[in-house]
UniProtKB/Swiss-Prot annotation:
It catalyses: (2S)-2-hydroxy-3-oxobutyl phosphate + 5-amino-6-(D-ribitylamino)uracil = 6,7-dimethyl-8-(1-D-ribityl)lumazine + phosphate + 2 H2O + H(+). It comes from the Bacteria. Pathway: Cofactor biosynthesis; riboflavin biosynthesis; riboflavin from 2-hydroxy-3-oxobutyl phosphate and 5-amino-6-(D-ribitylamino)uracil: step 1/2. Keywords: Riboflavin biosynthesis, Transferase. The lineage of its organism: Bacteria, Pseudomonadati, Pseudomonadota, Alphaproteobacteria, Hyphomicrobiales. GO terms for cellular component: cytosol; riboflavin synthase complex. Gene3D superfamilies: Lumazine/riboflavin synthase. NCBIfam families: lumazine-synth. The active site is at 95 (proton donor). Its EC number is 2.5.1.78. (2S)-2-hydroxy-3-oxobutyl phosphate binds at residues 92-93, 134. This is 6,7-dimethyl-8-ribityllumazine synthase. It is an enzyme of class 2 (transferase). GO terms for molecular function: 6,7-dimethyl-8-ribityllumazine synthase activity.
């Protein structure tokens, strides 16, 4: 099995004082735990804090982000960004394609509509072994990658003066 490629791009990862939302789908619990460990470590390295919300599956992630970010904004403490974590493993039916495409589409629409720095860490794989390799913080670290993407977008928005 090929080792997933790692991004070598150095991006701004100083999010000191920023508070991020992590929404995780724990349908595959052990994979979810690895994704979460990577995301939490990346946010810690960026000196950011986080709040965690868990949902049953990948399709519930976008609406959970919408609800939580709206609530935080109304409370006067908006999130600096969000990290979506989950896993969709191909099965024998068309369900995989629906969940993979619709969760990604909804996340992109949410991020663009609300100018929300968002890292998509929803794995879409053929096998559980592929998911484990990509989720493991010591190998693929896709949870960490998603958090680093959200932090980089937050830093970009901060530099552009686009934060509310």
């Amino acid at each position: 099995m090929a080792i997933p490629r790692r991004s070598l791009t150095e991006l701004d990862q100083n999010a000191a004082g920023a508070h991020f939302l992590i929404v995780e789908a724990r349908y595959y619990d052990s994979i979810g735990a690895m994704l979460l460990a990577g995301a939490k470590a990346a946010l810690e390295r960026a000196r950011a804090s986080h709040e965690l919300v868990s949902v049953p599956g990948a399709l519930e992630i976008p609406i959970a982000i919408e609800i939580a970010t709206d609530q935080a904004k109304r409370a006067g403490a908006p999130f600096a960004g969000a990290v979506a974590l989950g896993c969709v493993i191909r099965g024998e039916t068309y369900h995989f394609e629906i969940v993979a495409a619709e969760s990604a589409r909804a996340l992109m629409q949410l991020a663009v509509a609300h100018k929300l720095p968002l890292g998509n860490g929803i794995l879409t794989v053929d096998t559980e072994a592929q998911a484990e390799e990509r989720a493991d913080p010591d190998r693929g670290d896709k949870g960490g990658d998603a958090a680093r993407a959200a932090v980089a977008l937050h830093c970009l928005a901060r530099r552009a003066g686009a934060l509310s």
